[in-house]
Amino acid sequence: MVDDPFLFGKITANHCLNDIYAMGATPQTALAIVSVPFGLEEKVEDTLSQLLSGALEVLTAANTQLVGGHSAEGAELTLGFTVNGLIDREQVLTKDRLQPGQRLIITKAIGTGTLFAAEMRGKARGHWIAHATQSMLTSNRAAADCFKRHGATSCTDVTGFGVVGHVLEMLQPSHTELDLDVAALPLLQGATETIGAGITSSLHSRNLVRGEMIENYEAAASDPRIALMFDPQTAGGLIAGVPEDQA
């Protein structure tokens, strides 16, 4: 997604911390899984050092200790973290506790999937990618704390399933429906242009099957904002159900 291993480490750490924040928990420790492309020993060591330095910057800011992990050489650069956290059992935020009358709040603009697909094709503007990268580098920690203070009952993070997929994960167990104003969705700069040009990530077509769950989907499908609701996200935002008087 990004060529800079230091930034890649930061983005990956944010992405992995989101699962903890989405449950209302406080991260404690992390284990790394790293694969660095084959190369000269000095190059491999430098890439690994930059990856972990970026990740450690994010983890340290989250008061999370990197306690170990596993590294290897492989065909391509990969990085992931298993993050452990703590929470009071009575305060867990799950996906199945939406309540009628609540408002859904999303903490980040969407569009990383289509924007970086466009960047790979040489069809994205530099300031679009810079804006998207800054979004991915932004932690959801403060937003998660805000949700807890204002009575959120249900929460999820937006990743590969896109907004529609993750919202459906919240709606179906709760047996609730949602009135969604697409004009209120925050969008990353350039996302409507790239999705409107038909540039999508590899996961987008899989996500489109959930369109049948949306009323009047066929009539609105040509709107690029509708297409962006199926766009998979990396280090995306949180979506939480909050009482209307707290929203």
Per-region residue spans from a language model:
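Helix-biased detector of long, well-ordered alpha-helical tracts
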Residues: M1-A247
